[in-house]
Amino acid sequence: MAAVSLRLGDLVWGKLGRYPPWPGKIVNPPKDLKKPRGKKCFFVKFFGTEDHAWIKVEQLKPYHAHKEEMIKINKGKRFQQAVDAVEEFLRRAKGKDQTSSHSSADDKNRRNSSEERSRPISGDEKRKLSLSEGKVKKNMGEGKKRVPSGSSERGSKSPLKRAQEQSPRKRGRPPKDEKDLSIPESSTVKGMMAGPMATFKWQPNVSEPVKDADPHFHHFLLSQTEKPAVCYQAITKKLKICEEETGSTSIQAADSTAVNGSVTPTDKKIGFLGLGLMGSGIVSNLLKMGHTVTVWNRTAEKCDLFIQEGARLGRTPAEVVSTCDITFACVSDPKAAKDLVLGPSGVLQGIRPGKCYVDMSTVDADTVTELAQVIVSRGGRFLEAPVSGNQQLSNDGMLVILAAGDRGLYEDCSSCFQAMGKTSFFLGEVGNAAKMMLIVNMVQGSFMATIAEGLTLAQVTGQSQQTLLDILNQGQLASIFLDQKCQNILQGNFKPDFYLKYIQKDLRLAIALGDAVNHPTPMAAAANEVYKRAKALDQSDNDMSAVYRAYIH
């Protein structure tokens, strides 16, 4: 591949890892962000996603030269929105250039005039100038009366413009904050960098740490610069992260990837077991993105809708696994997860060398480790991938996926994770994702109980619950979760988006996780008791927000 000449401000197509090429712009990195060692790379901000990353030069292509090619390959909605953002950026930049063309012409005229004044004047010209001198002085006097002070040529320029003219940059020398890039700024891009879309340019506040600029951006950068070296060996060794060169086995930063752009479906056959609240949305998105999917559910009627959408029907879990390359499973609890694998006509009976199994259930680390061992012992490959989200996020394909286990299988699931989620995290050895998922749900469940407690306390003290919600929505606690759950309570709508019985199960497992390492979890324990009371009030199959009823009965 021929070398491509790129400069700061150039529009490019950037290829990041396993994701499709995405439109972006080469920008200056934050001053305290070190450039990765090794091959030459540029810092790129992607349109439509707010993601940033160092991209190797061989993974970059000029935007205009490859535009038609990329548009033919990718057809997704988010990809098209990103392309539209680029075109809007170009339109506004062009309009800015046209607006400034007149001032550029004036500058040129002034330079020409200056050159005329600086050349030697002949005798004839001196006589002509002396004859017209009186008229010139008169006109200048009239001009002073008409033109307000401050509108002179010097006064019409901004302080920044004057500073730039007084301190011109030496040719070929990049500004101080561009030294890491070692590239000159393209003259054709200067207008774009100052145009109406200036918000697209990376502009860190020097008085604030970079991580405050974009929470996801900070984690994304960590994932690009601090990835631990990982490898896998057979059976149990295959499921462990190898020690880094320093000898430390701790994971400094999870390997995460922002899922964006259109999805190019894998040619592998996909199986899916379990069509509950979460599984149904996941399968629907897999089918929409063009995957070949075989489904199974304990109650076969739930499969009918997906058969109409193009899915195939599997009669047993073993049949699905044996006929598919990668099989996902999403069931309710540890017992259901074990029964699915170890029971009659279960997953284990269909496992052969090379078959892949991905468990998306929220279970404890011991359960998922046991499942991994039996799958790998049959020559299969295993990945745990519980998801953070609810029914609506599942339907929208906006789940957060926490994966651990076989790194190669994680890569093979790329298009599937793109279809079902907005972000995926790789957390290392089997059991890490289960632990992280329980901690996430422990925080969520405890917060939900606190919300319910606050609303009931407001009610019994004569305060408006709606006003409390309005105040919370204007403060630091404001979130979609807070607003939706409070609205559910105020409207008395407890249609399940996340079953109360499942959040209580996760709290119980999180408390057990704390007990196993002798770590106190008093807040989770208190919340768990409230959920147990709500279950006793027959709220198990309602949404988790129904914990509110435990406080009013």
From Swiss-Prot:
Disulfide bond annotation, renumbered to this chain: none
Binding site for NAD(+): 271-285, 362, 505
Cellular component per GO, a single term: chromatin
Region (Dehydrogenase domain): 261-553
Protein name stated in the entry: Cytokine-like nuclear factor N-PAC
Main localization of the protein described in the UniProt heading: nucleus
Known DNA-binding region: 168-180
GO MF, one annotated term: DNA binding
Keyword terms, alphabetized: Chromosome, DNA-binding, Isopeptide bond, Nucleus, Phosphoprotein, Ubl conjugation
Protein purpose: Cytokine-like nuclear factor with chromatin gene reader activity involved in chromatin modification and regulation of gene expression. Acts as a nucleosome-destabilizing factor that is recruited to genes during transcriptional activation. Recognizes and binds histone H3 without a preference for specific epigenetic markers and also binds DNA. Interacts with KDM1B and promotes its histone demethylase activity by facilitating the capture of H3 tails, they form a multifunctional enzyme complex that modifies transcribed chromatin and facilitates Pol II transcription through nucleosomes.
Location of Phosphoserine modifications: S130, S167, S540
Gene: GLYR1
Boundaries of every PWWP domain copy: 8-66
Annotated region described as Disordered, given as residue ranges: 92-190
Family: Belongs to the HIBADH-related family. NP60 subfamily.
GO BP terms, alphabetized: transcription elongation-coupled chromatin remodeling; transcription initiation-coupled chromatin remodeling
InterPro entries per record: 6-PGluconate_DH-like_C_sf, 6PGD_dom2, 6PGDH_NADP-bd, GLYR1_PWWP, HIBADH-like_NADP-bd, HIBADH-related_NP60_sf, NAD(P)-bd_dom_sf, PWWP_dom
PROSITE patterns for this protein: PWWP
Subunit structure and binding partners: Homotetramere. Interacts with MAPK14. Interacts with KDM1B at nucleosomes; this interaction stimulates H3K4me1 and H3K4me2 demethylation. Binds to mononucleosomes. Interacts with GATA4; the interaction is required for a synergistic activation of GATA4 target genes transcription.
Biased composition, class Basic and acidic residues, residue ranges: 92-145, 162-182
Domain of life: Eukaryota
Subcellular locations according to the entry: Nucleus; Chromosome
Chain spans, region Interaction with KDM1B: 216-225
Residue ranges, annotated region (Interaction with histone H3): 214-217
Comment text on domains: The A.T hook DNA-binding domain is required for the interaction with MAPK14. The PWWP domain is a H3 reader and strongly binds DNA.
Site (Required to promote KDM1B demethylase activity toward histone H3K4me1 and H3K4me2): F217
Cross-link Glycyl lysine isopeptide (Lys-Gly) (interchain with G-Cter in SUMO2) mapped to chain: K135, K176, K179, K201, K211, K227, K237, K240, K269, K302
Species of provenance: Bos taurus (Bovine)
